[in-house]
Swiss-Prot record:
The gene is hcaE. The keyword Metal-binding applies. SUPFAM superfamilies: Bet v1-like (SSF55961), ISP domain (SSF50022). It holds the Pfam family Ring_hydroxyl_A. PROSITE patterns: RIESKE, RING_HYDROXYL_ALPHA. The lineage of its organism: Bacteria, Pseudomonadati, Pseudomonadota, Gammaproteobacteria, Enterobacterales. The keyword Transmembrane does not apply. Binds 1 Fe cation. One of its GO terms (molecular function) is 2 iron, 2 sulfur cluster binding. This is 3-phenylpropionate/cinnamic acid dioxygenase subunit alpha.
């Protein structure tokens, strides 16, 4: 059995000097350890409460590579279970979502209530004449399930910090999407799913820390949608905001703490997002006053940038895309993309949000394709022995971290930096090399204290 010491995790990651060895993206032993110590110990996004509003409503998803079913209970609470029959490990729920009074295994017919209890075993008196203790063979329940403003998270590790503590200061940035209007948010439409042939850490890192790539990877989109020489805007539709935000922003920052990351520009108008269409742009202008009252000016104006909650929940504020990077081996990730909107928005605006999110960041989105091509090409190159063992530079903004005095929380830097990436890989290494959550927290705290010296 491979142990963390065998893998020399801290020799692969040197966050103090900004170095990473790309073998972390290819090694199957590292990947198996990730499934155990990251996806088995961290809070993972499961679903949005709007997807399971009534008792018996369920949504099927994954925690790492473990299939789980999330179910609204009769009392309104939410439970999640391993989607696996306790008889021969068969899946008990196949539909992506729906409403059910029970989950029945198609193999031998064992049936479970929505509370996870085993309620029926076919031919039980004949098959188990000695008796069967059904109370012992209910579905394996995810022991920790909590919600944050509509987002449902699960955790297998009962010793982990609670969800509120786990989120920490990233919650302030997350509220900029979840708390703009009275009534909160909801998921619009279904889930778009596709597979990218790359390690899950590539997209997670980019959404945590990388605004820098947009100037180059998305150059063609910026040229099409960007400002004309005469200063007027090109438009995809009525009200389309087109000028690149990094040209117009008065300030910008990146947040990186506890493995989480966020970055955004301080804009001066409530529709400063090049990737949204006219109806969405107008909606942001019309609802700005309410958002400012609830969030303050900085977050109310924040409609561009990047975000990731460690390990795999990412979102983009202005384009209303929320996505999860489900790992599928060391060289593959399955993307699940949701459109998240204010619940109070009109049906017309919600449809416009969905169109904008799909156009830019759907599986064939004009920005999504740029990103996917980058990640896939890197993964191909890392098949080479020398390539996957040659250290990479992670020095951008090294030593420039600070805490702001304007009420914006956490460890920050200028937006074009890798503060959040270094923090993400530090938390990653701490989790892989630690036996307990307390050890993880102590190591991360020591790293962050050193960063702020």
């Amino acid at each position: 059995m491979t142990t963390p010491s065998d893998l020399n995790i801290y020799q692969l990651i040197d966050t103090q000097n900004g170095r990473v060895t790309p073998r972390i993206y290819t090694d199957p032993d590292i990947y198996q350890l990730e499934l155990e110590r990251i996806f088995g110990r961290c809070w993972l996004f499961l679903a949005h409460e709007s997807q399971i509003p009534k008792p018996g409503d369920f949504f099927n998803t994954y925690m790492g590579e473990d299939a789980v079913v999330v179910v609204r209970q009769k009392d309104g609470s939410i439970k999640a279970f391993l989607n696996q029959c306790r008889h021969r490990a068969m899946r008990v729920s196949y539909a992506d979502c729906g409403n059910s009074r029970a989950f029945t295994c198609p193999y031998h017919g064992w049936s479970y209530g929505i509370n996870g209890e085993l309620i029926d075993v076919p031919l039980e008196p004949r098959a188990y004449p000695q008796g069967l203790c059904k109370s012992h063979w209910g579905l394996n329940e995810v022991p920790c399930v909590e919600s944050y403003k509509g987002l449902i998270f699960g955790n297998w590790d009962t010793s982990a910090p609670g969800l509120h503590d786990y989120l920490g200061d990233i919650a302030w940035y997350l509220d900029g999407m979840l708390d703009r209007r009275e009534g909160g948010t909801e998921i619009v439409g279904g889930v778009q799913k596709w597979v990218i042939n790359c390690n899950w850490k590539f997209p997670a890192e980019q959404f945590a820390s990388d605004q820098y790539h947009a100037l180059f990877s998305h150059a063609s989109a910026v040229q099409v949608l960007g400002a004309k020489d005469d200063g007027s805007d090109k438009r995809l539709g009525d009200g389309q905001t087109a000028r690149p935000v990094w040209e117009t922003a008065k300030d910008a920052l990146q947040f990186g703490q506890d493995g989480h990351g966020s970055g955004f520009f301080f804009t001066e108008k409530p529709d400063a997002n090049v990737w949204v269409d006219g109806a969405v742009s107008s909606y942001y202008r019309e609802t700005y006053a309410e958002a400012e009252q609830r969030l303050g000016e900085v977050r109310a104006l924040r409609l561009a940038g990047h975000n990731n909650i460690f390990p795999t929940l990412s979102w983009l504020n202005g384009t209303a895309t929320l996505r999860v990077w489900h790992p599928r081996g060391p060289d593959q990730v399955e993307v699940w993309a949701f459109c998240i909107t204010d619940k109070a928005a009109s049906d017309e605006v919600k449809a416009a949000f969905e169109n904008s999110a799909t156009r830019a960041f759907g599986p064939a989105g004009f920005l999504e394709q740029d990103d996917s091509e980058n990640w896939c090409e890197i993964q191909k190159l890392l098949k080479g022995h020398r390539a996957r063992n040659s250290k990479l530079c992670l020095e951008m903004g090294l030593g420039q971290e600070k805490r702001r005095d304007d009420g914006i929380p956490g460890i920050t830097n200028y937006i074009f930096s890798e503060t959040a990436a270094r923090g993400m890989y530090q938390r990653w290494a701490d989790l892989l090399s630690s036996e307990s959550w307390q050890e993880v927290l102590d190591k991360t705290a020591a790293y962050q204290q050193e960063v702020m010296k």
